[in-house]
């Protein structure tokens, strides 16, 4: 238990210095301890990201969250209050849409991680289902993570924060970023009036709609939560066949074009 407390304190100390320029939950509230059982924290000595447990051996995250010496934390809620349900794993294998990891901000920002050994489900560790259909515009979805809760001057919580946002028409994101392609395998999601958003530290975490992981936190503007500047999420439904093929053992499966 002493070692766990030391680790927890180290995570808290370094988290504020360890974020890539990516995503967080601004404008949210502390997650209920029972609502984020699939939420995973990916971490090394340089930065942290989110992820989602999809079965006993596999975690889904963003390609730009790839890191050396990745450690995978499951069942965590409050970093300052360790509990016996917490698990730690390392990455055994990682899979990307392109072997070169030549993803872009608007396409193929997805990573599938096989852990070094399976986890046992518990009251604080459970998987999230892959999508059976894509979300519709207007759907209310849930975001969560240990990312910054203020922006641009970031502060980071020791517990994950959650918030609701809406699936928006992709044209809203193109209006905010005219350089985006006309079509993309991303979801545009947020609150048009601003105030709620993912932000630094939330990258790789889930966008949950109707109890399924529909999106992966990919990128957004800085400062976060600006009006008319929603976030961008990898559209998981478009990659479901690829994910299932990799898990089934077809490691040469290709992503959709």
UniProtKB/Swiss-Prot annotation:
Q: What keywords would UniProt list here?
A: Disulfide bond, Fibrinogenolytic toxin, Glycoprotein, Hemostasis impairing toxin, Hydrolase, Protease, Secreted, Serine protease, Sialic acid, Signal, Toxin, Zymogen
The superkingdom of the source organism is Eukaryota
A Gene Ontology annotation in the biological process aspect, one of them, is: proteolysis
Per UniProt, the enzyme's principal EC class comes to hydrolase
Q: Which residues form the propeptide?
A: 19-24
Q: How is its activity regulated?
A: Inhibited by diisopropylfluorophosphate (DFP) and PMSF.
Known InterPro entries for this protein?
Peptidase_S1_PA, Peptidase_S1_PA_chymotrypsin, Peptidase_S1A, Trypsin_dom, TRYPSIN_HIS, TRYPSIN_SER
SS bond list: 31-162, 49-65, 97-255, 141-209, 173-188, 199-224
Active-site residues from the entry? 64, 109, 203
The entry lists its GO molecular-function terms as: serine-type endopeptidase activity; toxin activity
Q: Which GO terms describe its cellular component?
A: extracellular region; secretory granule
Predominant subcellular localization, coarse grouping? secreted
Could you state what the record's PTM comment says about this protein? Glycosylated. Contains 23.0% of hexoses, 8.3% of hexosamines and 1.0% of sialic acids.
Q: Which Gene3D superfamilies match?
A: Trypsin-like serine proteases
Q: Where is it located?
A: Secreted
Q: In which tissues is it expressed?
A: Expressed by the venom gland.
Annotated signal sequence is 1-18
| Enzyme Commission code(s) on record | 3.4.21.-
Which residues are glycosylated according to the annotation?
44, 78, 102, 153, 169, 250
Where in the numbering of this chain does the Peptidase S1 domain appear? 25-248
Q: Which family does it belong to?
A: Belongs to the peptidase S1 family. Snake venom subfamily.
This chain's protein is named: Beta-fibrinogenase
Organism taxonomic ancestry: Eukaryota, Metazoa, Chordata, Craniata, Vertebrata
């Amino acid at each position: 238990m002493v070692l766990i407390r030391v680790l927890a304190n180290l995570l808290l100390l370094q988290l504020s210095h360890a974020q890539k320029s990516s995503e967080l939950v601004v404008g949210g509230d502390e997650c209920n301890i029972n609502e984020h059982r699939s939420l995973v924290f990916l971490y090394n000595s340089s930065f942290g990201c989110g992820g989602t447990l999809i079965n006993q051996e596999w975690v889904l995250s963003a390609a730009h969250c790839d890191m050396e010496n990745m450690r995978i934390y499951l069942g965590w809620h409050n970093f300052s209050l360790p509990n016996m349900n917490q698990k730690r794993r390392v990455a055994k294998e990682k899979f990307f849409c392109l072997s070169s990891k030549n993803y872009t901000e608007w396409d193929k920002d997805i990573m599938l991680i096989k852990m070094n050994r399976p986890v046992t489900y518990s009251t604080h560790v459970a998987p999230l289902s892959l999508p059976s259909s894509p979300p519709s515009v207007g759907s209310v979805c849930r975001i969560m993570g240990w990312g910054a809760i203020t922006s641009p001057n970031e502060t980071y919580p020791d517990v994950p924060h959650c918030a609701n946002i809406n699936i928006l028409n992709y044209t809203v994101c193109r209006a905010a970023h005219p350089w985006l392609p006309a079509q993309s395998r991303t979801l545009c999601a947020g609150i048009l009036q601003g105030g709620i958003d993912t932000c630094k530290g939330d990258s790789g975490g889930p966008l949950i709609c109707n109890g399924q992981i529909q999106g992966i936190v990919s990128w957004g503007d800085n400062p976060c939560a600006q009006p008319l500047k929603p976030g961008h999420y990898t559209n998981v439904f478009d990659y479901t066949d690829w994910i299932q093929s990799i898990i089934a053992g077809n490691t040469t499966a290709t992503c959709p074009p």
